[in-house]
Structure formats: C-alpha cells, structure tokens
C-alpha cells in the first residue's frame, strides 16, 4: 500500500522531461517508468532532461554555413554542406566567452570572411573579430587550429599595406574536413604601414606609442607569441621576387605574380612554406607537402599558365588547379623557385607532352636555358665517348712498333700477314729488327730513288 501511495504521488508529466524527450516518446516513457519504480531518482532524471534540452538548444542555434561553389574547378573544390548535426570546428560558447584579452586592435579592416571594420582580439585560446557596435563576436578560430599565418604586402596600392592571412586546418582549399565537421573559413585583415593607432594590451595599455614598432610588426610579434603550432611567414627575396617592380610604389620590389583562376583575378605569392593564391574567397594555399607536381602550359610569347596538382594529406586523389595569364617576365623566377624546393616539374612528362614548352612557337628565357642545359648534357656524353676513343688510340700508339709496318708503307696489313708476323716473332725477333733497321736506313738515305735501284746493285 505504501508503494502504491508513493507511486500515485509521481506527476503524470514533468515539463523538463516533456521538453527534452518530445521527439523520443519511447525514451520518454522509459524515463517515466524508471521514476515510477524509483521515485527518489526523479530529481536526477529531471536534471538530466534539463541538460539534454540545453544541448539541443545549443545545437539548434549553431550557424549553418552556406555552400560555396567554385565553378572553374573539380568537384573536390566544393565546400561541404554543413548542417545542425555537424560538429563545429570550435565551440561557439568558448569562442564568445568573456575570457581575458591578451591583445586587441580597433578599426581593423577585414576582407574575409566578412568585409567590414571590426575589433581584432587575441585571447588565451582564440583569435576572433568583435563587432564594434553590437559588441558581439562575429567569427574566430582557436589558436591551436591555425596551421599557416602569412603577412603579405598588398599589391597595387598607392599606400603601403599588409594583409594578414589566417589559414586554419581544413581551410586551405586543398584539404577537406572529415565527415560531419564544419569547414572553417580563412581570415584576412589589412593593416597600414606605420605605427599602430588603436592597439592595446589585455589590460588596456596602448601599444606602439613610441613609434618604434610598425603595426604589421606589432601584430606579427603578438601572433608569434600566441600561436602554438606555427609562426608568421613573410615574403623573402631569397625565395622569389618578381621581375617587375611594384607598379604603384616606385622603387619597391614586388613579391606577387598576377594570375587568373578561371575568371577570378588574384595574386600568387611564392613563399618559404608554400604558394598562396588570394586575396578573394576562397583563398587557396598549397603547402609543399600537398604539392604533387607543378607544370607549365600554354606558353606564349608574353604569358604562360601554371598548373598545380595538389594531393590532400589524407587522400590519394589529386586535384588540379590552373592559374593563367602569368607574365613571361616572371617565368625564370618561378621556375627557379620550383626547382629550388624540389617540386616536381612535370612539364616534360608523358601525360603533358602535348602541352610542352614552345607549344605556340614562342620560347621563354628559361626554356632556352633548359634546352641549352640539355644540349650540354648531350654534348658531355659525346665528349665522353670521344675521350674514350682518344684514350684507346693513345694506348695503341704506346704499343706501336715503328718498324713493324714498314713493308706495308703505312697502308696496314691483312689478317694473314698478321699471323705470319706472329710466327716470325716466335722464331727470332732480333734478326728481323736488324734487317728492318737496315732497310729503313737505306730508304732514309735514298728516299724515292731507292725504288729504281735494282736489288743486285745494292
């Protein structure tokens, strides 16, 4: 009777359980049955239901990323569709939490993934961008997910500027995320050359007021101190510098090469860790370990195309990226960069033999050099053969006996005569040498007249 009394006191419905298991009626019934049998666990089940509801609400409010399709590339270049069941690359709760700041810079111009001015923030675990009006965090990335950070001069600007490119894991345009994991976006922002105007440490102290450190160097230092897996990479003259100087800033060297990917115009940067094509979405970064081969096609008098075959780290399938309309003036520098880093130059491979250099009758500077190099190699083989032949002749001359061929007047002898000579050598070499010596002396003294003197007169 006591059990029946307790059982009847259990409410027929508990709001938390109803909300948590509304989509699972069978599971909800089992929860109620368990509470009926052990009423003392009712509060525990209710707490579990509340926690389940909070998880469902967090997943439901997770942002759904749109599909980005690159029309001028293979199917692997499509960004994967992400849905509410996908596990985000970072927890939005952690990203937006009020953790202590280590650095922030106001009025920073972002270009990717959004074009607007935001506040750049670096916390103990995240790099993020905060809306300056609403104070909401717009986007960000965990610091330990960042694989590459680049600081590159912005091409074709009258005022010198630098683009910082943050490339998280699976955001390089080559490697796709695992199934069910959201593909993160690359992040690009711009800073002007000169001292920072609104940069602060985590405690609010303004940085760069002594004018000893430019804005780009300050941001680079902060990132290098904060990033656990990588460092900031900048262009290096020892890697590549364009043959054409910066058009809008006279006297300044250019580190970019203008190119097209399909109809999209952009810039190629050849760096110490890989090749970047930017700065519009989607950025593509070819780390050296993902480059399968690089070749040249459509080599014309003024332009050529660069083909990069990339292989994702966790896949054997390759993707091909073509960058067109590259100025011939940069052919030599690009080719030197490719050879320096041991990237496979497959332009002469069998599969590309129809698209070899000089396909349209034009010859680039490095192509001519390559042909000359091949000629040198070919010539060296001929020289080697000639040298071996000359060495053999030298050996024959060392073994040559001046008197042995006098009977033939230098015209050589038949094989039968050689056999006779061998037999005569066995019988008595000394006598033959004396006789031949006498004949040689007579010929020496009389010259051509020796032919007219009868033997008996001698």
Swiss-Prot record:
Compositionally biased region (Polar residues): 82-95
Membrane-crossing segments per the record: none
Domain of life: Eukaryota
UniProt xrefs under SMART domains: Rtt106
Keyword NADP: no
GO molecular function, one term: DNA binding
Name listed for the protein in its UniProt record: Histone chaperone rtt106
Organism: Aspergillus niger (strain ATCC MYA-4892 / CBS 513.88 / FGSC A1513)
Record's compositionally biased regions (Acidic residues): 367-380, 390-408, 415-437, 446-458
Gene3D superfamilies: 2.30.29.120, Pleckstrin-homology domain (PH domain)/Phosphotyrosine-binding domain (PTB)
Subcellular compartments: Nucleus; Chromosome
Span list, region Disordered: 71-95, 359-458
